[in-house]
Structures are given as C-alpha cells and as structure tokens.
Amino acid sequence: MSEKALTLKQSGVRWLWLAIVIFLADIGIKYVVMNNMGYGWANRIEILPFFNLLYVHNYGAAFSFLSDQAGWQRWLFTGIAFVVTGLLTYWMSKLPAKEKWNNIAYAMIIGGAVGNVFDRVIHGFVVDYLDFYWGNYHWPAFNLADMAICLGAAMIILDGFRKKDTAKA
C-alpha cells in the first residue's frame, strides 16, 4: 500500500456495495423464515436427504458458543462485530479498489457481521435456518450471514498462501 491517500472511488470502500447486498439478502431471508415457518424441529422442511430448512434461534455465536449464558454474550458479540466491521472498513479504505480478492473478502465479512448484529440487536438472538446433516449427525444450523463470514475468512486465509507462493517464484 502506498502512502498516498486513496479517494473513495480508488479505495476498496467501493466494494461496500457487496456488504450491503449480503446484509439485505440476509435480513430478507430471515424475515421470510420468521414469518412463514414454524419454530423448531417439528416444523422443519425436508428439502434433500441431507438438508432441511429449520427455523431456530441462536443466542450464542458459531456452534451456539456461549448460548447458555445469561444474555451478556449478546452485547459481547455485538461489540466484537462492530470492532471487526470498523477495522475491515478502515483496511478497505487503505486498499486500492483493484485488489478485488481482499476487498471482496472484507465486504463479505462485513455484510455477514452486520446481518447477525441486526438480529442480535432487534431480536436478541440470531435467526438460523440451514440444517445440513448426515445420518443422525446434524451440523449446527446457520444462515447466509454465517456463510458470508466463513467464505470471506477462507478467502483471506487462501490469500495468505497465495502471496507466499508468489513470493517464492
């Protein structure tokens, strides 16, 4: 990154439109799920032999981490999401817009984080609805925001390997 300040058009902030699309799609899907599906296992919709739509509340983080706590975790995870969103937006402002890979990764994480924060602040929980399973083993239910966060993080990790390989050549 150069020392010269980038304009908004030149910087990765241009890619925040993707975060907005992810956020709007996430809350839109969650709205449909909350208003059209019954809550819980008995109301699941079997789609494929390994996939259900299932409306559940997650009071914790990934894998329902800390979901059994008294409620303080809601604000902890909200605070973490705000800090991460701020840092990633700052980094995007320093990255040239042409560095698509990292800007897309950051925008995906921001969109997902803001989608889940919206749920935490408005509802007190995150709405999850995707249930993948094999036999009797079910992966923890998740949502579009979770997928965006994970894919963005995977892109950042892959970029770290990609840059090392390029440096060796």
Curated annotation (Swiss-Prot):
Location (main, coarse): membrane
Catalytic residues (positions): D128, D146
Gene Ontology cellular component terms for the protein in this record: plasma membrane
Membrane topology, record value: Multi-pass membrane protein
Reactions listed under catalytic activity: Release of signal peptides from bacterial membrane prolipoproteins. Hydrolyzes -Xaa-Yaa-Zaa-|-(S,diacylglyceryl)Cys-, in which Xaa is hydrophobic (preferably Leu), and Yaa (Ala or Ser) and Zaa (Gly or Ala) have small, neutral side chains
InterPro entries: Peptidase_A8 (IPR001872)
Molecular function in Gene Ontology: aspartic-type endopeptidase activity
Localization annotation: Cell inner membrane
Pfam families: Peptidase_A8
GO terms of biological process kind: proteolysis
Recorded superkingdom: Bacteria
Keywords noted in UniProt: Aspartyl protease, Cell inner membrane, Cell membrane, Hydrolase, Membrane, Protease, Transmembrane, Transmembrane helix
Biological pathway: Protein modification; lipoprotein biosynthesis (signal peptide cleavage)
Transmembrane segments: 15-35, 47-67, 75-95, 107-127, 141-161
EC number assigned by the record: 3.4.23.36
Similarity comment: Belongs to the peptidase A8 family.
Function: This protein specifically catalyzes the removal of signal peptides from prolipoproteins.
HAMAP family linked to this entry: LspA
Protein name in UniProt: Lipoprotein signal peptidase
Annotated source species: Vibrio parahaemolyticus serotype O3:K6 (strain RIMD 2210633)
